[in-house]
Curated annotation (Swiss-Prot):
Gene Ontology CC terms, in alphabetical order: cytosol
Organism: Mycolicibacterium vanbaalenii (strain DSM 7251 / JCM 13017 / BCRC 16820 / KCTC 9966 / NRRL B-24157 / PYR-1)
InterPro entries on file: ATP-grasp, ATP-grasp_carboxylate-amine, ATP_grasp_subdomain_1, PreATP-grasp_dom_sf, PurT, PurT/PurK_preATP-grasp, PurT_C, Rudment_hybrid_motif
A GO MF label: magnesium ion binding
The protein's annotated pathway: Purine metabolism; IMP biosynthesis via de novo pathway; N(2)-formyl-N(1)-(5-phospho-D-ribosyl)glycinamide from N(1)-(5-phospho-D-ribosyl)glycinamide (formate route): step 1/1
Gene: purT
Reactions catalysed: N(1)-(5-phospho-beta-D-ribosyl)glycinamide + formate + ATP = N(2)-formyl-N(1)-(5-phospho-beta-D-ribosyl)glycinamide + ADP + phosphate + H(+)
UniProt entry keywords in alphabetical sequence: ATP-binding, Ligase, Magnesium, Metal-binding, Nucleotide-binding, Purine biosynthesis
Highest taxon of source: Bacteria
Family, similarity comment: Belongs to the PurK/PurT family.
Protein name: Formate-dependent phosphoribosylglycinamide formyltransferase
Domain ATP-grasp: 120-315
Length: 400
């Protein structure tokens, strides 16, 4: 039986989020609705999640001493990483010492903090199908890897980055140097290591939200949400929709792959498993042990959205992955480089049938920064996609 205390009391159930962007913000809201005391941590002040949490803390999360000191001072029941750029060795040590519990596990946080750990686990340990790949530490190694078998076209990514930063496709030798420089500029930390992947000729890519939660008998069960289709530009999510139609054989294979990798990572919570699909063939791409940006569509498509599923699962509560309606999401971009922007056209956006919006409250806007998302539900995915895109296009951030 799960017992939850009263926030801001000696018996409070305390959860600390490491990373407090738009996804963390929604997790914090879901936790608070269940009576949890929340601590939002980020590298800068006034991050979206810090605006709604009981407590806000700002530290360099890649500094193991700062991270340990904060966790030892706050003594949260659970520590929930929401980003990759964290001093994971400190989390592993604190978990081993019994200071706190890391979600889903400290090992999972370490393996998924960069593309190398999770790719080696999936391809080399679990034997899951992936694109051909090499890891490189220099432009010379990258060139040799491509010429030595990866070939063109190929995709280059920093081993540690988020939201598509530093990711590019190379169609020929003339693009190699520029791709290397772009990858270096997009890395989340001072790391010169990249992954180069052979291009998979897929029909589409999906996110399969996979939930590990306790069932009625107390044992951990794996459940799957309906597949989420998404469109990316330069590796960054632009729109997503649910459900994405798939042949039964491909869907079963996708669930087998997602189940295998999340079972090995262990723990409880939601995982965003990214997969390439061509006909009945499925390839593993990446996994995040947390809610996924493409999964924001679940705020209008599921009875329990991905943030509520994560909150429930980590607290040991029952989950329900049932789809209630087809729907879509579309990104609202900053459009300007400015602090403290205002948003025009919110009323116009909400006049589009069956739509809603989320503005993330980011303190600073950039031209291509994700500042919000439009959501729409409809009788079919195509209508929902059109309506979400229309609503997003009516919102205009403006510098003041």
């Amino acid at each position: 039986m799960t017992t939850i205390g009263t926030p801001l009391s000696p018996r409070a159930t305390k959860v600390m989020l490491l990373g407090s962007g738009e996804l963390g913000r929604e997790v914090l809201i879901a936790l608070q609705r269940l009576g949890v005391e929340t601590i939002a941590v980020d590298r800068y002040d006034n991050a979206p999640g810090q605006q709604v949490a009981h407590h806000a803390r700002t530290i360099a999360m890649t500094d193991p001493d700062q991270l340990r000191a904060l966790i030892e001072a706050e003594r949260p029941d659970l520590v929930v990483p929401e980003i990759e750029a964290i001093a994971t060795p400190a989390l592993e040590a604190l978990e081993a010492e019994g200071v706190t519990t890391v979600i889903p596990t400290a090992r999972a946080a370490r393996l998924t903090m960069d593309r190398e750990g999770i790719r080696r686990l999936a391809a080399e340990t679990l034997g899951l199908p992936t694109s051909p790949y090499r890891f490189c530490d220099s432009l010379e190694e990258l060139t040799a890897a491509i010429e030595g078998g990866i070939g063109y076209p190929c995709v280059v990514k920093p081993v540690m980055s988020s939201s598509g930063k530093g990711q590019s496709k190379i169609d020929g030798p003339e693009g190699v140097a520029a791709a290397w420089e772009y990858a270096m500029s997009g890395s989340r930390v001072s790391n010169t290591r990249i992954i180069v992947e052979g291009f998979v000729d897929f029909d589409y890519e999906i996110t399969l939200l996979t939930v590990r939660a306790r069932g009625a008998d107390g044992e951990i069960e794996t459940r799957f949400c309906e597949p989420i289709g998404h469109r990316q530009v330069s590796g960054d999510y632009v729109e997503s929709w649910q459900p994405h139609p798939m042949p039964g054989t491909a869907l079963e294979r996708a669930r087998q792959i997602a189940g295998a990798v999340t079972r090995d990572l262990g723990g409880q919570g939601i995982f965003g498993v990214e997969l390439f699909v061509k006909g009945d063939q499925v390839w593993f791409s990446e996994v995040s042990p947390r809610p996924h940006d493409t999964g924001m569509v679940t705020m209008v498509t599921q009875w329990q959205n991905e943030f509520e599923l994560h909150a429930r699962a980590i607290l040991g509560l029952p989950v329900d992955t049932t789809l209630k309606s087809p729907g879509a999401s579309a990104v609202i971009y900053g459009g300007v480089d400015a602090e403290g922007v205002v948003f025009d056209g919110v009323d116009l956006a909400l006049r589009v049938p069956h739509t809603d919006i989320r503005l993330f409250g980011k303190p600073e806007s950039f031209v291509n920064r994700r500042m919000g998302v439009a959501l729409a539900f409809a009788d079919d995915v195509d209508t929902a996609r059109r309506n979400a895109a229309e609503a997003a296009g009516r919102v205009t951030p403006r510098a003041v």
